[in-house]
């Protein structure tokens, strides 16, 4: 979709509280909407109160990180390790055990319920 292209390929950001995946609470896996690379397990998802799907840990080797200095801020951008699609940002204000908050754009992901 145009919204997926904007986020995944142009590093856009969806408006908070607009993704159905923010309210997804079933067991399953969140994958890249661009290539279906498995990114996050639902067991690491938590409600961060930000309006974006948030996780405290990605699956092994699923994502990469780069420095993002856009908009006068220095942040760590998160991208799909397979296709390079922009997913969101990671912050150090998350819960235990990692203390990290992977703040993801829901439009950049798909969800597959556990069978």
What are these regions (language model features)?
Residues 2-115:
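A short Gly-Trp-Pro
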